[in-house]
Amino acid sequence: MSHILRAAVLAAMLLPLPSMADQAGKSPNAVRYHGGDEIILQGFHWNVVREAPNDWYNILRQQAATIAADGFSAIWMPVPWRDFSSWSDGSKSGGGEGYFWHDFNKNGRYGSDAQLRQAASALGGAGVKVLYDVVPNHMNRGYPDKEINLPAGQGFWRNDCADPGNYPNDCDDGDRFIGGDADLNTGHPQVYGMFRDEFTNLRSQYGAGGFRFDFVRGYAPERVNSWMTDSADNSFCVGELWKGPSEYPNWDWRNTASWQQIIKDWSDRAKCPVFDFALKERMQNGSIADWKHGLNGNPDPRWREVAVTFVDNHDTGYSPGQNGGQHHWALQDGLIRQAYAYILTSPGTPVVYWSHMYDWGYGDFIRQLIQVRRAAGVRADSAISFHSGYSGLVATVSGSQQTLVVALNSDLGNPGQVASGSFSEAVNASNGQVRVWRSGTGSGGGEPGALVSVSFRCDNGATQMGDSVYAVGNVSQLGNWSPAAALRLTDTSGYPTWKGSIALPAGQNEEWKCLIRNEANATQVRQWQGGANNSLTPSEGATTVGRL
């Protein structure tokens, strides 16, 4: 054992251990949210297979360092399974996006198996967790020469049993997809095991750090929990439950429930976060003030921590190219900046749509918001309070390092009207319709005790898949020497150098070190920086460097 590793083991033994939930990368309620500090990029749009046929994995590989430098800790990848389907209704056509796959072969319209592995390796090496979109509910059972053979009449398919309509039957415990003839019986032991083994394969061979479960209205949430337990228990997961109260039958309790209650119930049973369609519905149908009614704005942190917030995605929003993509529920252009300002400064796990980030000119604005979120230490379960008496939406968000005051389409004059202390303006966009202030960095922000932004750098941080470089030190903002509370550095554009900005009290002598640990299990400390501690006296814009 090297002296560095020996020191790391000894240090870990002497430090307080995190809870078991923390060790597993789960919330206190055992939900797989990976610590609640993820910022996810949706790594595709609907027309990718037509705009960049057979080349998308190469593009993701080439963009890996940029994605990491932009502040994303995870990427939602397209469905990796082969889909050569096609459809046309006269005015529109499509197919091949992965949502009507026919087998688990990875040589599809996004690129080859080898290109997928290279992209996953590049992203993982840059510190970006790979989350695969998976579609267990249905498949293209009629495609010739597929590598999966599930004969009819043996209980593998929904329509092997009598179908009462769009309700569960003896061969399917969820809603049917379109007519239901393509729906798999995920409760059948062979079908269940087929997916369990494939999820394990994606984790072990293709760098999966988690999964996005498509169309979860089609199968029991408990099945998602079982798959995760059996194949990737410490990984991230999120479910797409796009089903409003009115879509449930009159005898179902969800028919008179709220969107929040419906999606939270799914999360409780699946033990996975869930897309915040409660917030999306308010973005589409309510005023900006109504955005507080999303799952991420719930007064209970156990509700906020499971919310995966988004503005638009490949289904709801527009895409470059043919027919503008799906755009089933697209947010109006005039609210896109306000929506990103909200999800990137508030609780929940935010997802940024690829086209908003890299195609349509919102990238610089989104980068600025990501930096504000990271510096403030806003997490999925951060506290949020809303303030009435003003137009638009006004909220105060308490991060681990700074407090943010957010005003959207509001007549709020200054943050002092709703929060005490010193604040400085962090964001002012859309002619004042988007304003964000942060605590501790106003004029005089260099005075002792005020929070200032310090750039941290750790050199020589070579890591394995699933590990990252962290800064840990002798103040609460640096975790009080606890690896479980250390601050992850997210800029890996110069890998193996890792960088990040951390807000620290000005004028106080502080000490810190670099360390490498597993992202999901804080007890798995791989390496502590050797030698003496790094020392600094924080001031606004200062830089401090450590070396592993």
From Swiss-Prot:
GO biological process: starch catabolic process
Cofactor info, note text: Binds 2 calcium ions per subunit.
Alphabetized CDD domains for the sequence: AmyAc_arch_bac_plant_AmyA, CBM20_alpha_MTH
A single cellular component GO annotation: extracellular region
Miscellaneous section: There are several isoenzyme forms of this protein.
The family this protein is said to belong to: Belongs to the glycosyl hydrolase 13 family.
Binding of substrate, residues: 99-100, 138, 177-181, 212, 217-218, 314, 326
EC top class named in words: hydrolase
Presence of keyword Magnesium: no
Main location: secreted
Bias (Polar residues) ranges: 529-542
Disulphide bond pairs: 161-171, 237-272
Pathway(s) served: Glycan degradation; starch degradation
Subunit structure: Monomer.
Protein name as it appears in the record: Glucan 1,4-alpha-maltotetraohydrolase
Keyword annotations from UniProtKB, A to Z: Calcium, Carbohydrate metabolism, Disulfide bond, Glycosidase, Hydrolase, Metal-binding, Secreted, Signal
SUPFAM superfamilies: (Trans)glycosidases (SSF51445), Glycosyl hydrolase domain (SSF51011), Starch-binding domain-like (SSF49452)
Annotated ranges, domain CBM20: 446-548
Listed EC numbers: 3.2.1.60
